[in-house]
Amino acid sequence: MSSSLSPSSPPTSPSDADRADEHTRSGGATFSTGWPEPSCVLITARGDLDAANANDFVDWAMQHAAHAKRMVLDLSGIEFFGTAAFSALHTFNVRCAGARAEWVLVPGSAVLRLLRICDPDAMFPLCDDVDTAMAALRGESQRLLKLVAEPR
């Protein structure tokens, strides 16, 4: 892990959740963490994720994920997503499965481009935006129009 990452800790109580907002920089990317709900962490990356910082990102994410039951990984602000970043994302997925942690990925166009090539089986849980991801983790589904009435 690069020395540009500074250790930090997530909120320890629900009252701290609204105030938590942490940032760090690694290579060509900025990572931030927020706690929109006490048991859910929002981990955001902006810029470039590549061989220089992909493992730093996973370490940053897992450090905060250790204190959450649910995670949203917001990569919608990623401008370049290299194959090392895909490999790191796979590592994140495996580590979350081992920890029985739920997570959802919000990809941007650069991330989607590589996922179409490297993840044809769509193994990562994807949502279009952070709000939809949060709703999915809470178990809320999008309301669908019912075309047939159910018997009472």
Where are these regions (language model features)?
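STAS-like cytosolic regulatory interaction modules
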Residues: 1-77, 91-152
